[in-house]
């Protein structure tokens, strides 16, 4: 029986999950919820089901796999990754994995807060000013390795791809000074199952955010 991934009909927090499901060849179907237009942004499609799915902490995204019902995007990623041996193995790898996972979420939220802020245009220059320093740290952390934990791809690479690539969408030249990050993006997109998914009708790179966002809402 296929797993069910529930989320808004956007890229958002589900992008890395969808990529990981595709990479692992997992059998899944999507339940995509649509948000209404301004000014009400009607969310009844989701709210009507929210407390009827048996989720401990009802939220989007969610993954239902038989009796396992999971919310929180990173918990979902870790669940899929454990099934397919796509987690760090040594203590050093696990430490890098934990640091990177949380750092990426901080930076993901930083961009999201900006893009939902009514003062977006006023705040954007400050974000762009700090972007090179942020990316420099990721570049140093990756170093000359193909993947962030070393020679083996793990679930944090899927989060890293999402965060780095959405910053590239936001500011197309932002990775130009970091060849290893650009190579990482190309390497990831060149993976056979990822490449096939990106060419399919299932692929959903846009909109990045919901209709309530100032940037990335289309």
From Swiss-Prot:
Listed GO MF terms: glutathione transferase activity
Keyword Lipid metabolism: yes
Example of a GO cellular component annotation carried by this entry: intercellular bridge
Site (Important for substrate specificity): 210
Function: Conjugation of reduced glutathione to a wide number of exogenous and endogenous hydrophobic electrophiles. Participates in the formation of novel hepoxilin regioisomers. Has activity toward aflatoxin B(1)-8,9-epoxide (AFBO).
Protein family (similarity comment): Belongs to the GST superfamily. Mu family.
Protein's name according to its UniProt entry: Glutathione S-transferase Mu 2
Species of origin: Macaca fascicularis (Crab-eating macaque)
